[in-house]
Amino acid sequence: MAWALLLLTLLTQGTGSWAQSALTQPPSASGSPGQSVTISCTGTSSDVGGYNYVSWYQQHPGKAPKLMIYEVSKRPSGVPDRFSGSKSGNTASLTVSGLQAEDEADYYCSSYAGSNNF
């Protein structure tokens, strides 16, 4: 039986001007154990497309978010290489290969947005 990787959209909050912009993620993605799933995160040339500072977070219910990918494609120590990040134009992607049951979670993207805005 397939199980879902639930996705939410993370807003980028402007810390200087208090401007706010949204990075667009699909509402959900799903796959069966062993398969691969790719999650997209679409922004603009002012955020995702303009900088190589896209991060991805995984959050299980009741737990704090965990950094999975930073600077588009870098993995922190301890994150399995089943998780990989990439970017093309204004869209960043997170691919989870060899899906495992523990991968079922919420996944958030974030991007630097310029002018001291995140």
Curated annotation (Swiss-Prot):
Biased composition, class Polar residues, residue ranges: 85-97
The Ig-like domain, residue ranges: 20-118
Pfam families: V-set
Region (Complementarity-determining-1): 45-53
Positions of the UniProt region annotated as Complementarity-determining-2: 71-73
Entry-annotated residues carrying Pyrrolidone carboxylic acid: 20
InterPro entries membership: Ig-like_dom, Ig-like_dom_sf, Ig-like_fold, Ig_sub, Ig_V-set, IgV_Light_Chain
Stretch list, region Complementarity-determining-3: 110-118
Keywords associated with the record: Adaptive immunity, Cell membrane, Disulfide bond, Immunity, Immunoglobulin, Immunoglobulin domain, Membrane, Pyrrolidone carboxylic acid, Secreted, Signal
Framework-1: annotated span: 20-44
Signal peptide (UniProt feature, chain positions): 1-19
Region: Framework-2, residue numbers: 54-70
Region (Framework-3): 74-109
Compartments in which it is found: Secreted; Cell membrane
Main location: secreted
Disulphide bonds in the chain: 41-109
Region (Disordered): 76-97
GO cellular component, one term: extracellular region
Subunit description: Immunoglobulins are composed of two identical heavy chains and two identical light chains; disulfide-linked.
Protein name as annotated: Immunoglobulin lambda variable 2-8
